[in-house]
Every structure is written in C-alpha cells, then in structure tokens.
C-alpha cells in the first residue's frame, strides 16, 4: 500500500491534505495536484430510488422524446442565456467543455498538448470515497482508470481517458446488433463485471450507459462510473440499497424488504443488457410503473424466434426469478454461445428486412418517464 501525494499546481511541492487515501500497489496511483481556487461545477448524483421513478419506454428512445430524461435547468448565470448549458471553464492546464449528452461529464482539453480527457467533479470532502473503487480494483482492460486528480478549495476534478460514446446510444442507433457483434461486446461487459465481483465490488446500478467505447472503431469497451458501486467485506454481498434503473431492476429488489445478493442482481442486469443488444428493446416494459414492476416480479418475457438457441439459453440463464439459479459472472464467460458465435465461419441468421429494424418507440400519453 502507498499514499498518493498531493502536489501544488503552482509549485509542484507535495502538501498534506486531510486524511490520507491509501492506494493499492496493484493499480497505478493517479497524479494529483492542488489548486488555489476552483469554479462551481455540478456533482454526479445517484440514480433516484425506484419508488421515485416512472418506467422506461419499450424501445430505446431518442434524445428529446417524452421518454428521454430531460437535462436539469442550468444554474443562474451559467452559460449564455436562460436555460442554456454551462459554458467552458478553465481548471489548471485544462479547458472544460460540458457534454450536453453526458450529464456531469465534461470534455477536458489540455491547453499545452491538445490531449483530450473526460472530467468529473466531486465535493472535496467526498472525492476520496467516490474514487475508492477505482483505486481498489486491479487494472483491467475493460474498466476505466483515473488519469489525474486536481484538488481545488471545495471541489476535486477527476480526469479519465477519452471515450467514443456509450453502449446505450450505440444500440439505439443500430436498432439491434447481430449476434457476432453482440457476443464480442457482451463478453467484454461480462469480463469487467466478473473482475469487479472477484475484487469484492458490486456494481448495483448496472446498465448499458455505463459502458463506453475505448476506440473510434467501437470494438473495445470499458466500464465507467464506479462512483456508486458497493465495496464488499469478504464474501458477503448482501445489499439493501434500492437505487437503480427500473428497466434493469431484479425481482428480488422489488420483493425484498431486507437484503438481497448484489452479485446476483448484477447478473440479472446483464441479462437485460444481453436481451436489449439482441432484440433492440427491454425484456420488461410498460408505461405504468406498477405494471412494469409486476411484469418483472413474474419474470415472464418473450424472445423473438430469430435469436439462436444458445443465445436464448444464455438469456434465460440470467433472467431467472430465483437469484440462486442464475449463472455467476465468471460462469457466463464459459457459456458455449460465445464460442459458437465467435468461431470462424459463423453466419448470423436473419429472417427478413422488416424484422431487422426495431421501430422507434411511440408514446401517446404525455408521461415523464425515468430512463437510464
């Protein structure tokens, strides 16, 4: 174990600051600097409780639709006119440009080298807890790492590698994926989740938006946004937290007043993700939250006929009502679907042009649906 230094942005000298955060030697310690002052910035928020959320739509809705989350109103004085997005700001050597499609995330451009990163801002008194999962996890190619931390008087600016869009937006634009591509990407998703579980971290609010592309070719994925994960003590993965996205929530979270297995709940979310990749919509959907949760509790869903038998088998192995009957994340990686789809010469079966494209979701009623 070692303690990361806090360096002054002006002098470069190490300075003590508050309780020390221990960094495991298994993962690189991010560089840290200290600012004299900092600008106001938004703080990443947890997903609301399920009881406070409306349901997600059937299909993956485009931005601006009634079923898409509306961006929060801009703070007074931020940006140009009323309701406009916050404008650029300068933090040390970086120019921060808020991303309209990624709440609480900014593009960070180094004014000296032109290097582009991503930046998140946290209150200074909470930032060590926020970045602790990144520090605890051993390095993994499918999990994002911290590049640098800059400390202001009241806020911490945490920098990550640049990405090329998230999986949710990608699936929405593609309608649904062929099995070969879905298998290649889903295997990376499961690999990241298995690595977290083996390192005593449960993700909790697991969904497609948390996976971003590492390359412009969109062939490599990595998991981001570990701030709201749960660090386990030993083998006990019992959770009582009810935060999450309605489309991905497991039956036991809805039925249990006490605790539930966090790892098993993550696996259910993986099942929702795989179904969505292959079908282009969620397995459980309804505009009424009560009806949606009732469908999830029953665990009944339909798989289109064009999905291969092995893919259907894997989906059903993940979306089991009984948590103990689900595969574990490491077991998913051994499922024969991956080998059968990714082997040379595999031909994806399609049953017709009309079945290859999932139509845009149409919502007649004017509801404010919570969407993750």
Swiss-Prot record:
GO molecular function terms listed in the Swiss-Prot or TrEMBL record: mitogen-activated protein kinase kinase binding; protein kinase binding; protein kinase inhibitor activity; RNA polymerase II-specific DNA-binding transcription factor binding; transcription regulator inhibitor activity; ubiquitin protein ligase binding; ubiquitin-protein transferase regulator activity
GO biological process annotation, one example: positive regulation of eosinophil differentiation
One Gene Ontology term, aspect cellular component: nucleus
Recorded consequence of changing residue 371 to L: In a lung large cell carcinoma sample; somatic mutation
Tissue: Expressed in most human tissues with the highest levels in skeletal muscle, thyroid gland, pancreas, peripheral blood leukocytes, and bone marrow.
Ranges of Pro residues composition bias in the record: 59-75
Region (Disordered), start-end ranges: 1-23, 52-86
Consequence recorded when altering residue 358 to I/A: Loss of interaction with COP1
Pfam family, one: Pkinase
Cysteine pairings via disulfide bonds: none
InterPro entries, per the entry: Kinase-like_dom_sf (IPR011009), Prot_kinase_dom (IPR000719), TRB1_pseudokinase_dom (IPR024105), Tribbles/Ser_Thr_kinase_40 (IPR024104)
Domain Protein kinase: 91-338
Positions of short motif COP1-binding: 355-360
Alphabetical keyword list: Protein kinase inhibitor
Effect recorded for residue 359 to A: Strongly decreased interaction with COP1
Functional description taken from the UniProt entry: Adapter protein involved in protein degradation by interacting with COP1 ubiquitin ligase. The COP1-binding motif is masked by autoinhibitory interactions with the protein kinase domain. Serves to alter COP1 substrate specificity by directing the activity of COP1 toward CEBPA. Binds selectively the recognition sequence of CEBPA. Regulates myeloid cell differentiation by altering the expression of CEBPA in a COP1-dependent manner. Controls macrophage, eosinophil and neutrophil differentiation via the COP1-binding domain.
Family of the protein in this entry: Belongs to the protein kinase superfamily. CAMK Ser/Thr protein kinase family. Tribbles subfamily.
UniProt domain comment: The protein kinase active site is incompatible with ATP binding and is inactive.
Subunit composition and interactions: Monomer. Interacts (via protein kinase domain) with CEBPA. Interacts with COP1.
Protein name listed in UniProt: Tribbles homolog 1
Originating species: Homo sapiens (Human)
Gene for this chain: TRIB1
């Amino acid at each position: 174990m070692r303690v990361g230094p806090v360096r002054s942005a002006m002098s470069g000298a190490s300075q003590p600051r508050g309780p020390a955060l221990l960094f495991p030697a298994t993962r690189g310690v991010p560089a840290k600097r200290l600012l004299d002052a900092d600008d106001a910035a938004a703080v990443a928020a947890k997903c609301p409780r399920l009881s406070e959320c409306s349901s997600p739509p059937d299909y993956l809705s485009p931005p601006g639709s009634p079923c898409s989350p509306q961006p929060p109103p801009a703070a007074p004085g931020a940006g140009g006119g009323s309701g406009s997005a916050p404008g650029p700001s300068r933090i040390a050597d970086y120019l921060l440009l808020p991303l309209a499609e990624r709440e609480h995330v900014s593009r960070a451009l180094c004014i000296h080298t032109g290097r582009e990163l991503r930046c998140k801002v946290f209150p200074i008194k909470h930032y060590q807890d926020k970045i602790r999962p990144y520090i605890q996890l051993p390095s993994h190619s499918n999990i994002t790492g911290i590049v640098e931390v800059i400390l202001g008087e009241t806020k911490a600016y945490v920098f990550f590698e640049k990405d090329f869009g998230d999986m949710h937006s990608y699936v929405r634009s593609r309608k649904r994926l062929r099995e070969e591509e879905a298998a290649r990407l889903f295997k990376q998703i499961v690999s990241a989740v298995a690595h977290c579980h083996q390192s005593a971290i449960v993700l909790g609010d697991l969904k497609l938006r948390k996976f971003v592309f590492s390359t412009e070719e969109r062939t490599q994925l990595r998991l981001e946004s570990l701030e709201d994960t749960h660090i386990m003590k030993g083998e006990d993965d019992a959770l009582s937290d009810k935060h999450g996205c309605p489309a991905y929530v497991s039956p036991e979270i809805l039925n249990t007043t006490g605790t539930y297995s966090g790892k098993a709940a993550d696996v259910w979310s993986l099942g929702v993700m795989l179904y969505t990749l292959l079908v282009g919509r969620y397995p459980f959907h309804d505009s009424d939250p009560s009806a949606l949760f009732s469908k999830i509790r029953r665990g009944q869903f339909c798989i289109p006929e064009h999905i291969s038998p092995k893919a259907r088998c894997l989906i059903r192995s993940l979306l089991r009502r009984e948590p103990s009957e689900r595969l574990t994340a490491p077991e998913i990686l051994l499922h024969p679907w991956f080998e059968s789809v990714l082997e040379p010469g595999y031909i994806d079966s399609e049953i017709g042009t009309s079945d290859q494209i999932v139509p845009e979701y149409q919502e007649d009623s004017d509801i404010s649906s919570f969407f993750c």
